Amino acid sequence: MSMVVRTLGRVDYLATVQAMQDYTARRGPQDPDLLWLCEHDRLYTQGLAGQDRHVLAPGDIPVLQSNRGGQVTFHGPGQVVAYPLIDLRRAGYYVKEYVYRIEEAVIRCLAQWGVTGHRVAGAPGIYVRPDDPGGHALLPLRPPKSPGTPAPAPDFQGLGKIAALGVKVSRHCSYHGVALNVAMDLEPFARINPCGYAGLRTVDLSTIGVRLRWDEAAQLLGRQLCIWLAP
């Protein structure tokens, strides 16, 4: 069964989350998977793991609680937000692979614009080297975890985060998703510790020299997600 893609444009965050929850609650085995592509007005969202100490100075930007995974992030105009509503049991993969597939779709999308996307162990999302966005050098390996000690902290040296990911799974079905920064006002990211990491730099495509309209970026991201989330 093919995924149904809907480009929604700019929509209210809370109304969109409610619509995702409603569809997930009522969907049956024959209902199609959906992919919603949209953007939101300026707001911060706190995930289930969110801590108030990571919201530094929100000012006039509202902070909303969300039932997605992860910590605090910012949404605003110029960001493509993709919400896959997938029956994971029917698709045949678990949450860990689902996250990997979303990240891979973003990486393949960036590659078509001449940008190399990277994963950072322990920190979901996609990162780029702002000073060398097209370079293919591998990131340093994460030191192994010693028995009885916490995992080493993620190493963001020389990196900027370009796509944030936070998902929710209910009744084996996913909602929420991934946000790709295209051409945004990035200043609000300085008012938080993005995704719970103090000092983590956030970038968008325009920062690294890629000029795209929102609809162009949304179309390609949607296409890659359809490919990589297929059963």
From Swiss-Prot:
Q: Where is the BPL/LPL catalytic domain?
A: 29-231
Q: What is its EC number?
A: 2.3.1.181
GO CC field:
cytoplasm
An annotated Gene Ontology molecular function: lipoyl(octanoyl) transferase activity
Give the enzyme class.
transferase
Q: Could you tell me which cysteines form disulfide bridges?
A: none
Q: Which residues bind substrate?
A: 68-75, 164-166, 177-179
Which keywords has UniProt assigned to this entry?
A: Acyltransferase, Cytoplasm, Transferase
UniProt xrefs under InterPro entries: aa-tRNA-synth_II/BPL/LPL, BPL_LPL_catalytic, Octanoyltransferase, Octanoyltransferase_CS
Keyword Nucleotide-binding appears in the UniProt entry: no
Which positions are catalytic residues?
195
Compartment list: Cytoplasm
Question: What is a biological process (GO) this protein takes part in?
Answer: protein modification process
Entries under Pfam families matching the protein: LplA-B_cat
Q: Which reaction does it catalyse?
A: octanoyl-[ACP] + L-lysyl-[protein] = N(6)-octanoyl-L-lysyl-[protein] + holo-[ACP] + H(+)
Task: Indicate the annotated site residue(s) for Lowers pKa of active site Cys.
Answer: 161
Biological or metabolic pathway of the protein: Protein modification; protein lipoylation via endogenous pathway; protein N(6)-(lipoyl)lysine from octanoyl-[acyl-carrier-protein]: step 1/2
Further comment found in the protein's record: In the reaction, the free carboxyl group of octanoic acid is attached via an amide linkage to the epsilon-amino group of a specific lysine residue of lipoyl domains of lipoate-dependent enzymes.
State its role: Catalyzes the transfer of endogenously produced octanoic acid from octanoyl-acyl-carrier-protein onto the lipoyl domains of lipoate-dependent enzymes. Lipoyl-ACP can also act as a substrate although octanoyl-ACP is likely to be the physiological substrate.
Q: Which HAMAP family match?
A: LipB (MF_00013)
Which protein family is it in?
Answer: Belongs to the LipB family.
| Listed name of the protein | Octanoyltransferase
Give the organism, scientific name. Verminephrobacter eiseniae (strain EF01-2)
Q: What is the lineage of its organism?
A: Bacteria, Pseudomonadati, Pseudomonadota, Betaproteobacteria, Burkholderiales
Gene that encodes the chain: lipB
